[in-house]
Amino acid sequence: MKIIQTFFIITLLWLSQGVQAERVKDLAAIAGVRSNQLVGYGLVVGLSGTGDQVTQISYTRQSLRNMLREFGIIMPPGVNLQPKNVAAVSIHAQLPPFAKPGQSIDITVSSLGNAKSLRGGSLLLTPLKGADGRVYAMAQGNLIVGGFGAEGNDGSRVTVNIPSTGRIPNGATVERGVPNPFNNGGPIILNLHAADFTTANRVAAAINSAIGAGTARPLDGASIQVNAPAVPAQRVSFVSLLENLEVDPGEAPAKIVINSRTGTVVIGQHVRVQPAAVSHGRLTVTITANPAISQPPPLSGGQTAVVPRTDIDIQEEGSRMFLFAPGVSLGEIVRAVNQVGAAPGDLVAILEALKQVGALSAELVVL
């Protein structure tokens, strides 16, 4: 018997009554001070028979030929390389701000072909390029792979985690730094992680109170302009003082986030509901499979067979109605839904319906 049910987890996010002060560095970032993405293409060698099947992945064979040619090894025409210990991979990394030549960064290596596992492999020297096509780092090293896989002669296979992706800590050496506008002089722009006019105004006020009037001014709901010293050493000390100032951020807007795939419902504290009456019913579908044996008549020459027989039963619960008074809070919403025996899936449907009729004073985000 198979009962179709929906299991959900409801997570309720309660915000504290008094907003805690946060540091400026936790609320905003300096414009221009950011990491940059690097990417590259290379070969992982030394695999224990778990590499690409080059008969199906032609670019792995071509890459291997090109690499051998770089070392002066020319394969005769008509020779088809069929190694099992080589895999074509992509490499990506984050180049942090202010990275200098000679520093090391972590890299992630992912299989591009049909390699079964990268465990035990070594990445050959690979250039990592930025969006402008220039080489900013060189990567090489032995992979650390968290997953593994095993396969039997009969085709059965067991895989734990993802063996086709690995990491190399400090696997790339920075060869070129990215120009940064931080030391160019002029004002510093603080960009809030979450745009909010109240927070922007409070950050500017906190800076002016600590450093001096006219030092900072909000440009919009996401940016604050701060006058800073032109000398690099003084700018570093100034930003160090700036980012440790504490600010009371503005309260988050009323919002409900629903993940329909996992059943997670997150409801902010300031969610309110206008007067509304809700009636919601549910269906329970029960499917029962009872195979039956079909016997042929005597001397008919037929064969005994198994005949599938499925019974489907649908039960509808009686609809229950409840009334939301003006300004109902988060706790009262959940309490009312629980009292009528509604599941989290029903709560999702109720919230969407309340939003449609204009009774829900909150932003509804469905993931």
UniProtKB/Swiss-Prot annotation:
One of its GO terms (cellular component) is bacterial-type flagellum basal body, distal rod, P ring. InterPro entries: Flag_FlgI (IPR001782). The keyword Repeat does not apply. GO terms for biological process: bacterial-type flagellum-dependent cell motility. Keywords: Bacterial flagellum, Periplasm, Signal. It is found in: Periplasm; Bacterial flagellum basal body. GO terms for molecular function: structural molecule activity. Residues 1-21 form the signal peptide. The keyword Disulfide bond does not apply. Pfam families: FlgI. Its main location: periplasm. Belongs to the FlgI family. The basal body constitutes a major portion of the flagellar organelle and consists of four rings (L,P,S, and M) mounted on a central rod. Assembles around the rod to form the L-ring and probably protects the motor/basal body from shearing forces during rotation. This is Flagellar P-ring protein.
